[in-house]
Amino acid sequence: MGFSQEDESEKPEAAWENPVLVIVRGIKYNESYKMLTGGICMGSYLHPGNDAFEVALNSEIYVDKTGLLTYTNKVMNTLQGYICNSRPRRFGKSFAANMLAAYYSKGCDSRKMFSGLAISQTADFEKHLNQYDVIHLDIQWFLSNVSDPEQIVAYITKCTLAELRTIYADQLPPEVSTDPDALSRIKEATGQKFVIIIDELDVLIRDEASNQKIQDDYINFLRGMFKGTEPTKYIQLAFLTGILPIKKLKT
């Protein structure tokens, strides 16, 4: 799939060798969908907010991990910008995904949150702060909210396409039925690329290991999103999290 695999070293730098993000810059916004000042639309998957990161900041113990953002800023729009953070539970993977969404997403204003943290001292802090259309998918959440696990890929696709169409309706006619096709068409029509964040990437591989249909559908979804030449045209940055090493996902 082309993702870098994280070194299991305890070095701080090595702990963030695997982020995956897809960012989209919106051109046209549906008036009925505006939820924030300034005309920016905040959704569940496209243009996520910063609430989850705010909870982490308000916690009794908070460790500044914004050095990860220095790295992702550096590798954005390069072959190194496909990152998979594979680590055991409780290693802060979801925290990292929420931090990336809060920093990059156009759907929120996170200046005060990051002020005083390490990233705010870097030269390109302002350049990337809340400048992108981020797609943030939590696969565990989708699995918990679908009645039939065999429909999860269709459910993910339905939800993301619905939000993409609120902004890119002119670029996405009714016949567009997959996320990769939608992102490719948007890039071709507008020149905009995406930051994609996928949390709990491997939950279906672990929890539905005995269901071959789910496995096949999901692997094909991931291949369509990230494998080959076409995704490099519409992906600005990708950050994926999971427990299993990426090589075990059979992609």
What are these language model-derived features?
Residues A15-E17, I23-T251:
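Phosphate-binding site recognition
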Residues F3-L21:
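Intrinsically disordered, low-complexity segments enriched in serine/proline and basic residues
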